[in-house]
Structure formats: structure tokens, C-alpha cells
Design a protein with these regions (language model features):
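Active-site-proximal beta-strand elements of phosphoester/diester hydrolases
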Residues: 67-69
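Core segments of cupin and vicinal oxygen chelate
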Residues: 11-62, 108, 127
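Active-site/binding-pocket entry motifs
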Residues: 62, 71-74
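A short, acidic/glycine-rich surface segment
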Residues: 37-42, 74-80
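N-terminal beta-strand motif that seeds the catalytic metal site of vicinal oxygen chelate
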Residues: 1-19, 28-33, 89-94, 143
């Protein structure tokens, strides 16, 4: 039935800040485009929809991310701070090699982590950090 997850779409209020954040993580831009028209209104079930999107990928992988900024109708936010235990979509996990060096590099870029690197069942090292728009991300290294 399904072949794979094609991409993850994130709606953001600051498209440039979100793009810059994911570029720091090693994503590259595949495409940037303004979206509008009857086809979009129907797909997203919103009247007079106009949005801009940036398609990103991690080079040499099938990891695809779409950042979307809706200009009309403007999106809203529920105002809650992202917490790991909130119901619904919670985080994006990125597999890395040498998690320690990745954390050091990202800290140099100004990224703040929830905690130091933790080890789960001697199988995986991991840590969480906060991205743009309250998105929680995880770094994971399998042992």
C-alpha cells in the first residue's frame, strides 16, 4: 500500500529563520516556490490559500522536509510552549554519526540542548533540542 514517508511538512511563521536553522543542521534547499490557486485551496481545504514553501533534504538520503509559510489565511498558534509530553506530533529524530562532535558543533552555532547526551539500553545515544517555532528535535546515534 504505502512505499515510504515522502516528507514531513512544518508550517512556520518565520520561513527564513526556519530555513536558516535547518541549513545549520546540514539540510540543503531543493526547491523554493510560491503556492496559490484553486488546486491549493482544495488540497489544504482553506479559501484563498497562498503560501510559500521551501523543500529541504539531507544530501544523499531520502530525508525530505517541507517548510510552509501561509500568507492567507494566516496561520495561528495555540500559544503553548512545546513540551515533550504534549499529545500529538512531538519531535523529529535525526540519526548521526559521532553524536558528541555533532553536539559540540551545534552548540557553537547557538543551539541549546535539553540535557547532556543520554544512553538508552546501551543501544542508542540521544539528546533533544528545540528548533524554530517550538519544534523539538532529537539527535540519535545507534551503538
Amino acid at each position: 500500500m504505502f512505499k515510504k514517508i515522502d516528507h514531513i511538512g512544518l508550517v512556520v511563521s518565520d520561513l527564513e529563520a526556519a530555513k536558516d536553522f535547518f541549513l545549520v543542521l546540514g539540510f540543503t534547499i531543493v526547491k523554493r516556490q510560491l503556492l496559490e490557486g484553486e488546486w491549493l485551496d482544495k488540497v489544504v481545504n482553506l479559501p484563498d490559500a497562498k503560501a510559500e514553501y521551501i523543500a529541504l533534504t539531507i544530501p544523499d538520503t531520502q530525508t525530505n522536509l517541507e517548510l510552509l509559510k501561509f500568507y492567507t489565511p494566516e496561520g495561528n498558534r495555540d500559544g503553548h510552549i512545546s513540551m515533550s509530553n504534549q499529545i500529538g506530533f512531538r519531535h523529529i529524530a535525526l540519526e548521526v554519526k559521532d553524536i558528541e562532535s555533532v553536539v559540540v558543533d551545534l552548540k557553537k552555532q547557538g543551539i541549546t540542548f535539553f540535557s547532556e547526551i543520554q544512553t538508552f539500553n546501551n543501544q542508542k545515544k540521544l539528546c533533544y533540542f528545540l528548533g524554530p517555532e517550538g519544534i523539538i528535535l532529537e539527535l540519535a546515534e545507534y551503538l
